């Protein structure tokens, strides 16, 4: 699934990339590998790759993951709870971590600083934040509340008690993207569908050009069992540019992903992931590619091809952002 996100959003040479909930940095490492595979001189500059996580052990594993994939310069930061909800990356000769100031940065106004601090904005945000009712942000202290009040979506959709962390990181992604920056974010399907988050969806559509929605089966994230949606979008250069797209009733690529190439099995409380291969309907044998390797029964490859074909018929900005190879 993470390959799908990387192939669709298409990070490339010269761009900055961040995952504010990086875990073991799969999105970051796959983006680096994907760029290297295209051509040698096209690869991402590993010094332009950033990740933040609140778990120190995750950052250690992320560092190892990046090193094993040939990236030894990615900037990976551990910042304990509340992590990148409060802490951002500031511009500088050496980028540094800075904390938002609750009294100055309420409601998403994050650019008002008492000094010359300037937050970094990125070309690409790829992330799979924590989400769901059991992972909601629940302010238990006055400081917790002051922190979450720096997010506009808290006043829109927070019920005074909690807000889905997926919503918080959706807003975070918007703020840290450059104009014409691209987003790939995996959220609970409920954020894209139920009434409670209607105002969040409206907030997003008033600020970003939704490019694609991919509904994913629950076993993609076996540890949660939650149905998820991948949202792909870009941030137009101006509100006027977005308004024009809305007036033109822009198109959104929508796809249900059903076949993922493996099945989950449980035996004696142990979870196993068994590959599922494509079967020839005539011979009932496992199909193989030109190199003799078995072909997985998955929808990702065709979905990527279909998306790229669809994108050829969209506005020039979208084509440039998602299809350009250099």
Predicted regions and their residues:
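A conserved structural/catalytic subdomain of Rossmann-like adenosyl-cofactor enzymes
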Residues: 102-326
């Amino acid at each position: 699934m993470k390959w799908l996100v990387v192939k669709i959003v298409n990070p490339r040479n010269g761009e900055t990339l961040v995952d504010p909930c990086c875990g073991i940095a799969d999105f970051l490492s796959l983006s680096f590998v994907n760029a290297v595979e295209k051509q040698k001189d096209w690869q991402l500059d590993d010094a332009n790759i950033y990740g933040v996580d609140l778990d120190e052990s995750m950052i250690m594993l992320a560092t190892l993951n990046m090193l094993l994939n040939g990236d030894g310069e990615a900037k990976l930061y551990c910042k304990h709870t509340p992590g990148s909800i409060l802490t951002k990356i500031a511009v500088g000769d050496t980028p540094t971590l800075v904390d938002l100031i609750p009294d100055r940065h309420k409601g998403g106004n994050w650019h008002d600083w008492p000094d010359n601090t300037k937050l970094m904005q990125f070309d690409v945000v790829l992330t799979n934040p924590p989400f769901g009712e059991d992972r909601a942000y629940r302010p238990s202290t006055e400081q917790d509340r002051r922190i979450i009040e720096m997010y506009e979506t808290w006043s829109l959709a927070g019920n005074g008690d909690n807000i889905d962390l997926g919503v918080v990181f959706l807003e975070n992604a918007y703020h840290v993207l450059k104009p014409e920056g691209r987003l790939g974010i995996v959220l609970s399907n409920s954020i894209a569908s139920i009434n409670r988050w209607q105002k969040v969806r409206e907030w997003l559509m008033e600020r970003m050009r939704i490019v694609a929605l991919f509904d994913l089966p629950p076993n993609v994230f076996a540890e949660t069992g939650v149905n998820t949606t991948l949202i792909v979008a870009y941030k137009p250069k101006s509100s006027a540019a977005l308004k024009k797209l809305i007036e033109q009733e822009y198109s959104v690529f929508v796809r249900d992903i059903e076949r993922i190439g493996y099945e989950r099995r449980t035996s004696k409380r142990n979870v196993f992931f068994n590959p599922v291969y494509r079967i020839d309907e005539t011979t009932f044998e496992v199909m193989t590619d030109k190199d003799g390797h078995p072909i997985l029964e998955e929808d990702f490859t065709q979905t990527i091809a279909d998306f790229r074909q669809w994108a050829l018929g969209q506005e020039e900005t979208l084509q440039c952002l998602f299809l350009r190879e250099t």
